[in-house]
């Protein structure tokens, strides 16, 4: 014997089921809201990866463990138009200096492991050129060594100079290219723009390739001070960080 259910009955039955399910869901207690800096920076980690470890595609860089002063300066640069990325500007525009510093200090405090460097396809000759520029600079082009400001171990110098290791080659290439083309700026005197202007495209590729392939040291924490400059080193004065001591003033 077949039971027959009218369309009206079916509709009422479906509504009763829906109401019952809704009541069941609403009866489940909501998780308590945690107003923490980790929760408030979810908009950051959505792109920059959990805990600011960096996105897997290499487009969004690591935030975790970078010097607080550097992160703060970059947040200001995005908010105030010295760096250009629409989404970042929109997120930061309504935020105060004090809140940006709180964000910077939070990410700076995170000590999470770096991924292993990606093997490079760059030629040995290109890598040698990159190593020389990073470690020694090029006096003929008046280019200082990268380690002069970014630290002997290239892990950065507190409070305002970032590390250069653990970053993808494409990201490094893009940022150096942005300095060279004038798309990226810092507080005057804009030392990075002046340095990169003296590098050709091959130099930029060499530096990015060598840094991206270089293994990280055991300690990735920023150095407390920049290394002493050797005699004849090219002096650098940066608006976003305290001026480095010139070689002539060293003993």
Question: Residue ranges of each PLM-predicted region?
Answer:
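N-terminal secretory signal peptides that target proteins for export/translocation
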Residues: 1-9
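Bacterial N-terminal signal peptides
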Residues: 10-24
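Sec/Tat signal peptide C-region and signal peptidase I cleavage site
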Residues: 24-30
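Flexible coil segments in periplasmic/lumen-exposed cytochrome c-class electron-transfer proteins
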Residues: 30-41, 50, 86-93, 97-155, ...
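The feature marks the first
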Residues: 32-81, 85
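His/Cys-centered metal/cofactor-coordination and adjacent catalytic loops
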Residues: 53, 112, 164
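Short, recurring structural edge motifs at helix starts
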Residues: 57-61, 89-92, 159-161, 194
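Extracellular/lumenal glycan-associated surfaces
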Residues: 65-68, 74, 162, 167-168, ...
């Amino acid at each position: 014997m077949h039971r027959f259910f009218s369309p009206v009955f079916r509709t009422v039955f479906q509504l009763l089921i829906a109401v019952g399910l809704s009541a069941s869901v609403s009866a489940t207690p909501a998780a308590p809201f945690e107003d923490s800096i980790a929760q408030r920076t979810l908009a950051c980690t959505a792109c920059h990866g959990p805990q600011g470890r960096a996105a897997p595609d290499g487009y969004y860089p690591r935030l975790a463990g970078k010097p607080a002063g550097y992160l703060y300066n970059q947040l200001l640069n995005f908010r105030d138009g010295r760096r250009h990325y629409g989404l970042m500007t929109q997120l930061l525009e309504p935020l105060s200096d004090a809140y940006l510093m709180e964000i910077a200090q939070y990410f700076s405090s995170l000590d999470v492991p770096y991924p292993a460097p990606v093997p490079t396809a760059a030629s040995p000759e290109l890598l040698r050129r990159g190593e020389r520029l990073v470690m020694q600079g090029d006096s003929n082009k008046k280019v200082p060594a990268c380690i002069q400001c970014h630290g002997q171990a290239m892990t950065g110098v507190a409070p305002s100079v970032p590390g250069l290791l653990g970053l993808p080659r494409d990201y490094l290439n893009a940022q150096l290219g942005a300095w060279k083309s004038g798309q990226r700026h810092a507080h005057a005197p804009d030392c990075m723009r002046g340095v990169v202007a003296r590098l050709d495209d091959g130099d930029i590729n060499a530096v990015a390739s060598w840094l991206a392939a270089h293994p990280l040291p055991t300690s990735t924490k920023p150095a407390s001070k920049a290394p002493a400059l050797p005699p004849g080193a090219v002096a650098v004065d940066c608006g976003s960080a305290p001026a480095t001591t010139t070689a002539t003033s060293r003993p």
